[in-house]
Amino acid sequence: DGECGGFWWKCGSGKPACCPKYVCSPKWGLCNFPMP
């Protein structure tokens, strides 16, 4: 359906993948900007 997770959306098991500019932060289980 093309849905993706925006900033600070819950991500991980059973959740939509984060939008391309975000990554799923394992620490918080939320979509966040990639950390350097």
Swiss-Prot record:
Disulphide linkage map: 4-19, 11-24, 18-31
Please provide the record's keywords in A-Z order.
Answer: Disulfide bond, Ion channel impairing toxin, Knottin, Potassium channel impairing toxin, Secreted, Toxin, Voltage-gated potassium channel impairing toxin
Q: Which GO terms describe its cellular component?
A: extracellular region
**Does the record bear Repeat in its keywords?**
no
Q: Indicate where this protein resides in the cell.
A: Secreted
Its tissue distribution reads: Expressed by the venom gland.
GO molecular function ontology, one term from the record? ion channel inhibitor activity
InterPro entries tied to this protein:
Huwentoxin-1 (IPR011696)
Q: Does the keyword Secreted apply?
A: yes
Reproduce the free-text note on domains from the UniProt record.
The presence of a 'disulfide through disulfide knot' structurally defines this protein as a knottin.
Other known facts:
Blockers of Kv2.1/KCNB1 potassium channels may be a useful approach to the design of novel therapeutic agents for the treatment of type 2 diabetes.
What's this protein's family per the entry? Belongs to the neurotoxin 10 (Hwtx-1) family. 44 (Jztx-4) subfamily.
- What functional role does this protein have? Gating modifier of Kv2.1/KCNB1, Kv2.2/KCNB2 and Kv4.3/KCND3 channels.
User: What is the name attached to this protein's record?
Assistant: Kappa-theraphotoxin-Pg1b
